[in-house]
Amino acid sequence: LYSQNRGEGWRLKTLLRVAAEHLAFINVDMESYDKKDLTLHIFKAVLSEPEFLHRDDVGIVIQCYLKDSGSDLIALRDWARQRGIPVWVRLVKGAYWDYETAHAQAEGWPIPVYQHKWESDANYERQIRFVMKNHQFLRPAFGSHNLRSLSHGLAVAEELKMPPGSFEIQMLYGM
């Protein structure tokens, strides 16, 4: 069993090496809440290694329907500041609300997601402002189809006088 252990984050390391050969961007997606802390840990651990420390073509997704997304962003900002190289952060609202709610209830755990859409929307807008205020450490990318949320992001960018090209608006085609 021990011989099968390739070290923490070996799959991400492999992807980063291949991406570098092809000048490709890697964005680490976030899926279920029970894997969130592990995903963040591996992301930070791998990008803190000397081989990957210089990489600024890597990002991670933060789901703003999670109640602890704000504290995750603070920790990510503090880590990126210490690292000295910014990372991209794609803010999304989240797509697994039903699963996260049902899974937590079935296990008797606290529900990790906001229970009302307006709470998720409000948190998304709070986190837009946080990431934009910290754009020298967290490169903002906003993944949404919601016109109000995107308009809010553009208004905050204008208010904060964000430099051109310092943030992105992203969306899935076909939605």
Region locations from a protein language model:
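Positively charged, amphipathic and often flexible ligand-engagement surfaces
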Residues: L1-M175
